[in-house]
């Protein structure tokens, strides 16, 4: 049972490869012993029917040499030769045309009745595959003779200049109309010779003005700047233009030195009316809790033993090195000190009137 299912699967793969024009897959399946005259159970089509339907002349020639029957009928009574729209395939099938004057009939499909099938196969509903290349008659002859086959260079349909043929040095020219390719070349993601199109011979590369790059670029972009590329020929090729300047926009104040983390620190003391922050710098390579505590105490003139905790405003407690590593530039921190009688900050600070123990709120509201 499994062998029968595998055999049907191989036959279906052969019909699909013939419909796609994949001559290598067709040869591989035929050489492995797949029946070239096997028919689909629904519509009765063989691999030769599909090759004629899609006008793959090379596949048709190979199937006929492999013993494909060109007289097999489908469930609608169609022979393979009736499904093709090209005269060269009809000649391969052995059908001679009486009227050979008009060459425009080669690409005219024959009118056929609409399919009566309840469904449309996937390879029929989506016939175009961009990676499938249909060889021409010359390529067919080269493949049969054992020579290499290369796709011929054809000009683009939109009127743009043709791409560089292999073996010729790329010339400096205009970029394609697609701005995405231009952006990729300017950003350095794609090499310039592969994205530049060839220009007519009368066009010569002229001087290109390079915009001056100021020293402030290091403040806007963390990406190291690339040296400008020269337009002089190097080993017979022209290098592309210099990458475009793309500033890095930062929401908020931007630190001057990227190696340092700038923080705002103060001592928590609600008794003082003016309790300003000071800025400290930490090395980004040493973002640890002990280093933060050491720098804060050194800058504020506080003994580390007096620090009870470090608070990230408004209400987050810093406890370990990972908390310090998550800090951003210009975040506000507060050192909470232990309250004691020997604390010079709290001893000298003048408490407000409402915090004194002898303050009477009811008496303050009386009117005399």
From Swiss-Prot:
Q: Which Pfam families match?
A: Ank_4 (PF13637)
What species is this protein from?
Answer: Homo sapiens
Q: Sorted alphabetically, which PANTHER family does this protein's record hold? A: ANKYRIN REPEAT DOMAIN 40, ANKYRIN REPEAT DOMAIN-CONTAINING PROTEIN 40
Q: What keywords are annotated for this sequence in UniProt?
A: Acetylation, ANK repeat, Repeat
Extent of Pro residues compositional bias: 149-169
The residue ranges flagged as biased composition, category Acidic residues, are 95-107
Q: Which stretches does UniProt call biased (Polar residues)?
A: 212-224
- ANK repeat positions: 9-38, 43-72
What's the protein name? Ankyrin repeat domain-containing protein 40
UniProt keyword Acetylation present? yes
Domain of life from the UniProt record: Eukaryota
The gene name on file is ANKRD40
Q: Where are the transmembrane segments?
A: none
- Region of interest (Disordered), ranges: 93-115, 139-176, 196-238
Q: Which SUPFAM superfamilies match?
A: Ankyrin repeat (SSF48403)
Residues that the record marks as modified (N-acetylmethionine) are 1
